[in-house]
Amino acid sequence: IKLSVFFMIKKLSKIEYILFSLLCIVSVFAFSNSMTDTYIVPKWCYTILVFVLYLIVISIKSLYNKILNFNVLTMSYIIVVVCTFQALYGISQWLQLVRFDNKYGITGSFDNPAGFAVSLCIGLPFILLCIKSISSRFWIFVMQLLALLFIFAIVISESRSGMIGGMAIICVELYKRLPIRINFKVIITCCLFISLLFGSYFLKKDSADGRLLIWNCSWRMIIDSPMYGHGFDAFRAHYMDYQANYLSQYPNNEYAMLADNVISPFNEYLNVALSCGFLGVLILVFGVLFLIVCYYKDYKYEKRVALLSLLGIAVFSMFSYPLKYPFVWIVMYFDVYVILRGSFIWVIPSLVKRILCVVAIIAGMVVFYKLCMRIDAEYKWNAIAYFPTNENVRAYKDLMPILGDDPYFLYNYAVALYGKGCLEESLNVALQCRTYWADYDLELLLGDIYLDKNEHIEAESHYRKASFMCPSRFTPLYKIYSLYRRIGDGKEATAMAQLILEKPIKIQSNTIDFIKAQVRRDLDRKSTRLNSSHMNLS
């Protein structure tokens, strides 16, 4: 055992494994309170930064014909160790040993349970490869305990997608091991999945029904551009418009009160269809078939493990958004590398290899520089995001060349300009943001800007759009009510007031209490004035 540990440490000391370890660590644990997005943006920024360093290092080694170290078992151990620390972190939150403030419950080092659960799901199969390489019963027992630890952490996260993904991996792995007939295996597997699906549905029924609405509206988007899709990041750019149009046509829809402000279709396959159309889905299918061919062409147990990891991602992708997280991409590319490895022999001429290495080094340095600028801009944005002074508004303008394609930055910039009374500039930035992002809050902001510009028809249009996007919200209706009062349309104002008072409440809040109380006071005052005028006349 001591000898094997020594050789493992010796392997890990090689630069490729150090960088791969760092890549996995930052993609899972990186966060920054000095960025406006505490979890996701830091993970992506620092993961890409380490990946670029990784690319430069292997390009330099290849240029000088040095041996590249890509031992699958060693890299699998790295993934398992990183996932183990993540599982322990989540369990520590569950036991309240670690203080955390997150409304979603057990999230580990992620923004919600989905990231936590998917990282453990895709790391689970690599424990099997580690067990396969170990002869010591003690270490096999330790690895089996780790597998149980991963499964337990997924369960306490209450991630339904994680439970289904984990169950898929376990069922496929146990399929050949169970000493029963194939027919019984199929029946048992189907029963387990159906039970898990129904259980997941009724565990959080409102959430599941909300996803059905999202998938319904997403299908309408696909129908409008079935072959080539709507382009990159199409869901964020257009989905809320489709949801608003659908709910305006069917205002009494049973899912209307569940509609919310969303930026993901909760299904990665739908996302591909929305962005790239059926052509993109077809390419994805051919890619999967190609990997299966490579798997059977040169079968090895490590390829089976990689395929199980990809299965976890594939199942998780049916109900959530695993590709939002950089660690999933790292493991997915690693899985693909393992499956392709040995299936084909690539012979690259020496000159071409050298040219590719030089290009990779130069491109890596350029990306590294641009990324450092982006990270610096993210820190500067966070420093000014919550204090819209004149100086900070000028700082927003200075950051536009770097962050001008980020809809969240543009929205905050438009809000800052609006707060300082720069209506025209605020409108221009908000409309620029609108090309990237269809959003409830953005519609309210546009309505406020047009209202202050005395363009009441445009203001009402945006308020109504916001109301149809999220029918359960009271703020758009109250803004329309206030607009009618402002222009002196008493009849429409009274009708809107009655609508607000009769509207059912989805989630009780101080804002809703204030709106209803204010509208009720206004109606009481109006009623008092009318009674007084009738008494004077009589």
PLM features: what roles do these ranges have?
Residues 101-103, 232-274:
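Interfacial juxtamembrane loops and adjacent helix segments
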Residues 379, 408-412, 441-445, 474-482, ...:
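Alpha-solenoid helical repeat scaffolds
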Residues 403-405, 437-438, 471, 505:
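Short coil turns that delineate tetratricopeptide repeat
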Residues 526, 530-538:
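Single conserved hydrophobic/aromatic residue that forms the stacking wall/gate
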Residues 17-33, 46-61, 65, 70-102, ...:
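Alpha-helical transmembrane segments of multi-pass inner-membrane proteins
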Residues 200-213, 359-391, 408:
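Hydrophobic alpha-helical transmembrane segments in integral membrane proteins
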